[in-house]
Amino acid sequence: MILKTIFITSIALASATRAEELSLTVEGAASYAVSHNPALSAARLRIEEASGRLDAAGRRPNPELEFDLSQNIRSREHGVGVAWMQKFPRTARLTLEKAVSRAQLAAAAAEVRDAERRLAGEVRVAAVSLLALEKERDLRSQQIINSEELIAFMSKRVQAGEASAVDAAQVELESKQMGTQVLMLDVEKAILLGTLRPLLGVGTRDTVNINGVLSDPGALPAKGASVVGRGDIRAAQANAEAAKQNVALAKAGKWEDFSAGLMATHELAEDAPDGFERDTMLGLKFSLPLPLYNKNEGQIREATAAAKRREKEIEAVAAQASAEIVAARGEMAALAKIVADIDGKLIPAAKQIEEQLRGNYAAGLTPLPEVIRARGRRFELESQRLDALRDYHLARVKHQTATGATPSPKK
C-alpha cells in the first residue's frame, strides 16, 4: 500500500513538473505576460492595499470611557466618576481624508496599468527580435550554402592548376566566418529567450516559441495620437488630485477635533455634625483645542509645494509621451522608405545582375565565382532589408507602447 502511494505521488509530481511548450505570436506573448508575469501580479496587490486604506480613511475615532477615583486618606470620604467622551471634527477633515485615499486608489490602479503597458512593450521587443533572428539565421544559412558552392568550384580549379590555393583558402575562411556568425545568432537567441522567460512568467525548463512573420510596412499611424489613456499620465493626474485634496486636508488640520461627552460622579462626604452624605451628579464635559502654538503651517507649505510639483509632473509626462509618439512615427516612416527602396530598386537590380551573369556563365563568358558572388551580394541586400524591417517593427512597438496600447490578459 505504501509503495503504491509513493508511486502515485511520484507520477503526480512528475506531471506537475513537466516542461511546458508555449507557442505564441508577438501579441499573444504580450497578452500572456500581462496575465502571468509574477512582478505584475505582485504590483496588482497595491490596488488592494490602496483599497484597504480607502476603507480605513474618513472614520471617526472611537469614543473614550474615562474613570476617576479619589479617596481621602484620613477618613471614609471618597469619590467615583465616569465620563464618556467623543471627538468631533471641526472641519471637513474626514471627507478630505476619504478624497485623498480615493485619489490614491485611482493612482495605484493607473500605475498597474502603466506597468502592464511597459511590460507588453518589453515582450513585444523581445518577440520581434526573435522573429528577426530566425529570418537572419535562414539568410546566413543560404549564404553558407552559396559559399560552399564557391569553395567546391575553387577547389576544382586549384586541383587543375587554374587558381591559386590562397584564393581558395580565403573563400573557405569567409565561409567559416559566416558559420561563426550563425553561432553568434544562436547566442543572441539564447540571450533573448533568457530575457523573455521571466517576462512571460515561465520556468527555465519550458520551451518558448514565437510564431509569425515580420510583415511588410503598412500605412503609418495617424498623427496626433492621444496619450490620455496612458497609465503614467492617469497616475500623474490621480496623484495631482490627491495632492490637491491633501492641501485642503493640511489646512483643515489647523483645527484639531473638539471633544464632548457626558459625566457622572458619586461622592461620599462628611457633613458635620450630620455625618456622612452621598451625592450623585450628572454633567457635560467639553474640550476645545486652541491653535495658539501649532497652526499646521509647515504641513500646509509642504502640501502646497507637493501639489504644484504634481501638476508639473503631468505636463512633463504628457510632453514625454507625445515626444515618444512623434519619434516612433518618424522612425517608422524613415525605415519604411528604406525597405521600399531596397525592394523597389536595389534587390531588383541585384537580381538582374545575377541573371545576366548566369546567362553569361551559360555562354562561357563569365566564370562561376562571379555568379556566386553576385548571389552573395543579393543575400547581403536581403540581410540589410531584414535589418530595416526589424527596426521598423521595433519602432512600431515603440509607437504602440507610447500610445498606451495594452493587450487583454491571456489565460
Task: Set out the residue ranges of the language-model regions.
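Small/polar (Gly/Ser/Thr/Ala-rich) solvent-exposed segments
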Residues: 41, 60-79, 88-116, 133, ...
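Hydrophobic h-region of N-terminal signal peptides that target proteins for export
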Residues: 10-19
